[in-house]
Amino acid sequence: FWNYIMKRCFLVVIDSLGVGEAPDAKEYGDIGTNTLSNVAKYVGGVDLPNFNNLGFGKITNVEGLGEKHSGTVGRLSELSIGNDSTTGHWELAGLITEKEFQTFPNGFPSELINKIELEANCKFIGNVHASGTEIIENLGEQHLTTKELILYTSGHSVFQIAAHEDICNLKELYKICEVARKYCDDYNIGRVIARPFKGSIGDFKRTYDRKDFGMNPPG
């Protein structure tokens, strides 16, 4: 086995598909989490022969999957501080995060917002911790009227900008996010996320053109 030369590998990342709580779960309110197992239980079991062959049933208890497999299976926990996507992706590439990305449960500081608004020639409304679908329903009408972009965050280190495609096209939205990314580095914010949506009042829908602007890894 060890004499075999691996010419290439396929690294598949299924973001947020957890297989059980990590040792630091209590620090993030994640006690008892197990996305894969809980989803399988909710739907009454899953039929995933390829996942089963890879060994997913060996990693955690998944209704519908067995322990028989043909692959080499392992289950790892992060050494990094943090539980967001960027931290995990960096560690997959060998970079350990020793300083957790900054979160802003009470909104972002005005000096950061002012810098972005000035350079990007835009205005923001919102600046709250919120669900993405709920905030476009709550502020969507105001956004359509004023053309001010919707700014919000979550429990992770994210600076999210939502805009209706008729108010701010993708090219403009991405450009604004690039400006935001530059200033968010100074605040140790992991990701700036473009959140375009479409539709009418009472029937807004986020599109598939989301784009994440991550902090460049150090080193």
Model regions and ranges:
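Active-site pocket-lining segments that scaffold enzyme catalytic pockets across diverse folds
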Residues: 133-218
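Active-site nucleophile/metal-coordination loop of metallo-enzymes that catalyze phosphate/sulfate
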Residues: 16-164
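Generic enzyme active-site microenvironment
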Residues: 13
